[in-house]
């Protein structure tokens, strides 16, 4: 009981002392320390002993605090120091965060300044180039070109790199201008204006006009501070002395005018130094470039710079990246080969067109023969009689009688009827205009061309001779009639054979023309090759030429035999004229074929040359 009572008393005393001193324990002010707070693992006596030890410690601290006179002030000071320490730590953290933010802000600000400076430099660069181009086009009052191309980056770099030299130049220029003004004022105090008007009365008007023109066409940035007179003496500009004397008088009267004049002169001095530096870089390059002011207003900075780079000449000092001579040679060779190839293809197409026109004209000159059914029947009868083609002649040769033997009256009547029908058909052909244009046989005995009247007269004479021959009994008249009839029939047979051979040749030629027209139509197609197309045609033409030559040789041999037989009968025979006509016609056909073959060969040669050029061009590329 005593121990429990003593422990409770001690507990109360310690709690009262702690509350009185304001000491904050582990459980906070006003919160009593219970045995449960010590932990559930301790036994009751262990908890009591631990609590007792803590209480003794608190009592000792309270006794020590109570002994000090200013214990509350000390506690408050300690608390204040602790709070200050905590605040200082927070401030350090805040300072660190603020330093990071400040650095980021400074970096952003620097980046913005750099971006702004780059944009301004680009604007100034483009504006300076525009002004220089406009000044070059206008000639700056004299209509003359500058001696060299402006280097746009030169003055900017000089101004940015060497500012003290620029200041010294300004000071030197100002001092020179002042000394010049003083000298001019001493030399020409009053008589400057009348001397100027007397010396050159027309010069001020021209200078005024040029000054106005330049001021109107110049950009607005330079229009404000630009003075009318020019300081340069060379390059087609007027003298300085009269204007300077006038300006000196004005400057004496008005100090503002003097200040403006000094600024303008300084600017012109800067321009002169910049121009002198640019002239040293490259001399002798005179070039006019179209102005970019109107074009560059609605474009971005990159577009303006690209346009200026494209329009700038190759020999200027700005364009340092020169093309190598090997690449220039290859480009020239490529352009040369390309031009030659284009010319070759143009010539090829022109030759194709000419060949087609030539063939069309050749085909139009020989139209088709309109064969009638009566004519075909008459030709069949003539072939049956044995005087048409060489085959008919071969079949009729064994049936023909010798020249000296007499013939039967039935055979003579049949031959006479056949000759009459042949004459009628022949006269019908002569009446046809197309046939008259192509075939015009002549007779040697009468030396007259064939006409309807002549044909009728011959027919009547033959009929009269035949009628008198049947009535006569004397052998002389019979032999004469037989000889004349035989000659006439032979002539008619030769004519009919020649006409049949001509018609056959014409039919063959028409077939060839049709094939050639088809080939020409196929030639116009780009994928068809001309060699493959012409090989078959050339082979066919060669075969046909061989056949025609063989047939001509056979017909000439048969005609030679007939001529020999006819010469035995009579010295005069009209078969020679028909043979001459056949020879002429065949010769014309051969000439035309030779021309076509020659044109084909030339065309092939041209194609081979064009292919070679194309291969060389492809190898070069």
UniProtKB/Swiss-Prot annotation:
GO BP annotation list: regulation of centriole replication
Compositionally biased region (Polar residues): 203-213, 568-578
Basic and acidic residues bias: start-end ranges: 171-185, 219-229, 505-529
Predominant location category: other
Amino acid composition bias (Basic residues), ranges on this chain: 159-170
Coiled-coil region: 328-359, 498-525
Subcellular location per the Swiss-Prot or TrEMBL entry: Cell projection, Cilium
Keywords of the record: Cell projection, Cilium, Coiled coil
Region annotation Disordered: where it falls in the sequence: 142-253, 385-421, 491-529, 543-586
Superkingdom classification of source: Eukaryota
One GO cellular component term: centriole
Name this polypeptide is given: CEP295 N-terminal-like protein
Protein's organism: Homo sapiens
